[in-house]
């Protein structure tokens, strides 16, 4: 198990908070990814625009590279709705992500229920 996966699983149960950046106050998907991958999170972003190009720019600026096949610890950029993007951490048998509907960070078994746009890896 990678360090990113262990870190992600340790955060399961942390409350969801839009633009959240700390386990004490809550996390959103960007805050979770930044914390787990030890990267700076963008400020003033909006994933509800559905702009894949802009999301890709942020991911590259954070030192991540796009990969064809996912492995544990990678980020999955997914599209839960027509104008919405979301980040999830790939773990064995599923994903860890900040789930707004459930109100906390969760581990979700199985493949993504949403279309996967791409996978990103920290180097």
Predicted regions and their residues:
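Short secondary-structure junctions and interdomain/linker hinges
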Residues: 15-18, 66
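Short, hydrophobic secondary-structure boundary micro-motifs
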Residues: 17-20, 44
């Amino acid at each position: 198990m990678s360090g990113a996966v262990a870190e992600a699983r340790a955060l399961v149960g942390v409350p969801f908070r839009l633009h959240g950046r700390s386990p004490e106050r809550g996390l959103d998907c960007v805050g979770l990814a930044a914390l787990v991958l030890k990267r700076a999170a963008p400020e003033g972003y909006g994933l509800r625009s559905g702009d894949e190009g802009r999301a890709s720019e942020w991911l590259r600026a954070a030192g991540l590279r796009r990969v064809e096949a996912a492995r544990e610890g990678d980020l999955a950029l997914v599209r839960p709705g027509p104008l919405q993007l979301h980040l999830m951490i790939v773990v064995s048998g599923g994903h860890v992500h900040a789930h707004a509907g459930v109100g906390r960070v969760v581990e979700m078994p199985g493949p993504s229920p949403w279309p996967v746009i791409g996978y990103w890896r920290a180097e």
